[in-house]
């Protein structure tokens, strides 16, 4: 029986020439819990990447809009095309579950952009643009819209857009023919909490929202009875220990490959937190919150074997690796750190053999 093989894609805030990263591609050693550099893609400020649900294509933010790539058999990336988003550089992107549309979140201009996807994975025309409006509380990052994450519900009916400037998540109905969005609901968060990222459980019935400035995760149930989206909060849980750095910002959310665990990181506190997900209720149990031996972790992810963990440390320009015992709540540094300029997002991808 052949061993499963994976590559890891790491996006970076870099100018993307031969000396300055772009997207890094690594071979994954599951036994050692380590990454070995394989290739890199020249692209400017690839602040976030996503892989299509059919696992065929990778899409990336860039200074010039978005770039599309065909994932090759060995995990390397073949460029398809680029497309403008008619605005400032985005910070997050995702696709719908039918691979018909690409959604881009605009932190700097508070904009949501919808682009059509073609059958060959290329990005087509813009079908909708929504400039979020309003004034938030008077704070450095919370006085105007900052759309930081856009994700479809797993039933593929609604787009949820986290606005950390306005402290809420807008819920839009997607017109699957025209690619237009219509506001249906608003999930309101605590003032100055800054909802940053969101994820839906594997069955689509639970929504997790991490709040950057207040360092906690809200857990909601999601139902769509009578074609009406309803979200009910069932839990709020901190991303920090009782003892922690005075200034900290919760970062991205990542599921384990089996959807049994949820991972986040705390920039400033420089720690990673792992939760066990209750299979029946979706509630979170904090297993540990421990230091990551780097500065300002923007992303953290479990390896596909759930025995190792990777942290992307934005300010120290490093990746750090750990062995993990999830049941015992242990995290032990594993091997030397790797230098990588301004890492921001990590994705593990299983290769077809």
Language model: regions and residue ranges:
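Asp-box/WD-like beta-propeller blade repeats and closely related beta-sheet repeat scaffolds
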Residues: 78-149
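Blade-loop segments of beta-propeller domains
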Residues: 37-99
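Short loop/turn segments immediately following the C-termini of beta-strands
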Residues: 13-15, 61-63, 107, 117, ...
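A short beta-strand motif characteristic of beta-propeller blades
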Residues: 36-42, 78-84, 134-140, 182-188, ...
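Short loop/turn segments immediately following beta-strands, especially the blade-tip
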Residues: 26-33, 69-76, 115-124, 172-180, ...
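Beta-rich, blade/repeat-based domains predominating
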Residues: 17-19, 43-53, 86-97, 133-154, ...
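Loop-centered beta-sheet repeat module
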Residues: 156-215
